[in-house]
């Protein structure tokens, strides 16, 4: 796998080797059937990978956001059925940003924040009533983090899952996306700094899914090349047929496009902003996922639809992730509003300068 600029190669090489050992097709399949992947998570957690990019004084593993995003790319590449993004890049980030210590176990977050909750405040405690939908791995979480805005202040509210009613649900890939009901649940609320709010949380969620999708598209493209070179039809590998080659090219170019977009957005976010690049990258990855899954399934034919072959673990994750933290319509509309706000003379500087122009 190619090296990413600005990322510690020791981290990525170790993560890649680990996933190669613990995330084979059978393990991923069993995780979907059983609704949990305890052994995979435990092996992942023992290395400290979930908490990369979180300062050690809060219980993190140190490192940069770029390191964490590269690990997420590998999670997507290997279709690892674990809450890596929620525990570190999202939930862990909210906890550390509000000065709270990270727990040793799984952390999850409400993707929609407090949007669907009735919130009442009493000092540094909040009472939450309502329902959170499609909460990743809520059933396995030690803490549920809810980003909440009360008046002009944004808080990271922490909830004990035992105080909630959790209904197990899954996404298209069989990953836990549970329903969490809050019935006057007490939550501790720690204030977040001004640069961490519901909007920046939304962007960071989109960035996490972009990294995951970039990895999955890359692996899907590689599987397609390998399979079509091995599969012989009419006396030669099917990869020699022009129609199949066209599908392989589409898969490869979308893999390169998604990874380039994810890395660009990650670098800008690591510098402290990157809103324009993240929105662009999520839209690019969403569209690349749609094209690549079609092309790669076409290249595989019937084999790609079987349970025994791993392609579906990737394509079903892509179909699920592309809807999380903003679909095409949301990010396309956001980019359109930003472009219009810059006026005709500001369009080219926006394209070439990105978020730096918006400051």
Segments predicted by a language model, with ranges:
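Alpha-helical interface subdomain recognition
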Residues: 1-77, 203-359
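Active-site nucleophile and cofactor-binding loops and adjacent substrate-binding regions
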Residues: 34, 61-62, 82-88, 110-111
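Hydrophobic alpha-helical segments that drive targeting, anchoring, or assembly
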Residues: 71-72, 80-93
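FAD-binding core of flavoproteins
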Residues: 82-83, 93, 98-218, 222, ...
């Amino acid at each position: 796998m190619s090296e990413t600029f600005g990322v510690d190669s020791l981290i990525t090489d170790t993560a890649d080797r680990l996933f190669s050992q613990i995330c084979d097709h059978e393990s991923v399949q069993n995780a979907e059937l059983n609704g949990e992947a305890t052994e995979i998570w435990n092996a992942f957690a023992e290395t400290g990978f979930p908490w990369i990019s979180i300062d050690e004084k809060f219980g993190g593993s140190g490192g940069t956001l770029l390191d964490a995003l590269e690990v997420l790319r590998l999670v997507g590449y290997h279709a690892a059925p674990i809450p890596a993004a929620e525990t570190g890049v999202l939930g862990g980030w909210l906890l550390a940003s509000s000065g709270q210590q990270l727990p040793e176990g799984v952390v999850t977050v409400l993707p929609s924040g407090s949007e669907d909750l009735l919130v009442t405040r009493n000092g540094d405690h909040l009472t939450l009533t309502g329902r959170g939908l499609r909460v990743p791995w809520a059933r396995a979480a030690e803490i549920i983090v809810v980003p909440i805005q009360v008046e002009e202040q944004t808080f990271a509210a922490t909830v004990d899952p035992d105080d909630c009613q959790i209904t197990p649900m899954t996404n298209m890939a069989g990953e836990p996306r549970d329903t969490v009901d809050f019935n006057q649940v007490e939550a501790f609320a720690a204030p977040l700094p001004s640069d961490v709010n519901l909007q920046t949380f939304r962007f960071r969620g989109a960035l996490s899914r972009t990294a995951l999708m970039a990895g999955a598209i890359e692996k899907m493209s590689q599987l397609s090349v390998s399979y079509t070179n091995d599969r012989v039809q009419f006396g030669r590998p099917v990869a020699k047929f022009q129609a199949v080659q066209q599908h392989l090219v589409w898969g490869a170019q979308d893999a390169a496009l998604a990874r380039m977009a994810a890395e660009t957005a990650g670098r800008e976010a690591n510098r402290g902003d990157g809103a324009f690049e993240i929105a662009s990258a999520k839209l690019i990855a969403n569209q690349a996922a749609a094209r690549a899954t079609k092309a790669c399934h076409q290249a595989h034919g019937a084999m790609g639809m079987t349970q025994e072959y791993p392609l579906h673990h990737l394509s079903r994750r892509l179909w699920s992730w592309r809807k999380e933290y903003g679909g095409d319509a949301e990010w396309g509309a956001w980019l359109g509003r930003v472009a219009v706000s810059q006026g005709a003379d500001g369009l080219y500087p926006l394209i070439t300068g990105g978020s730096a122009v918006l400051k």
